[in-house]
């Protein structure tokens, strides 16, 4: 909003790497595969996730799984990531849903298909 940078790019990169590899405790690999963005959970039921260059999201629901991560928070984050096309690992074919393209944020130019 203000454009004020509060951490250096190197610190941000380090924090996102740690979030991606360990932020969801022993299920971090599954989280990264399913949701596709670095995330950090807390044992109170909160989850913070970051899609670099796109934005962040937060969830809260106190029902936890065996790893200590919010069950509903994971479901919500996965749904939002897929709907909004936030995953770092999504192929070009996995674009945001049409309803998400009308939401806030920068608009992507639409590609026109070539017909022969």
Feature-to-residue mapping (PLM):
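Structured C-terminal helix/loop/strand segments within mature extracytoplasmic catalytic/sensor domains
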Residues: 1-113
């Amino acid at each position: 909003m203000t454009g004020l940078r509060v951490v250096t790019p190197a610190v941000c990169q380090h924090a996102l790497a740690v979030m991606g590899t360990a932020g969801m405790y022993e299920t971090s690999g599954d989280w990264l595969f399913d949701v596709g963005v670095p995330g950090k959970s807390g044992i109170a039921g909160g989850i913070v996730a970051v899609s670099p260059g796109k934005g962040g999201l937060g969830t809260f629901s106190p029902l936890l799984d065996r790893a200590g991560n919010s069950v509903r928070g994971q479901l919500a984050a996965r749904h939002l990531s897929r709907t909004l096309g936030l995953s770092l690992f999504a192929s070009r074919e996995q674009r945001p849903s049409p309803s998400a393209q009308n939401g806030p944020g920068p608009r992507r130019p639409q590609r026109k298909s070539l017909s022969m």
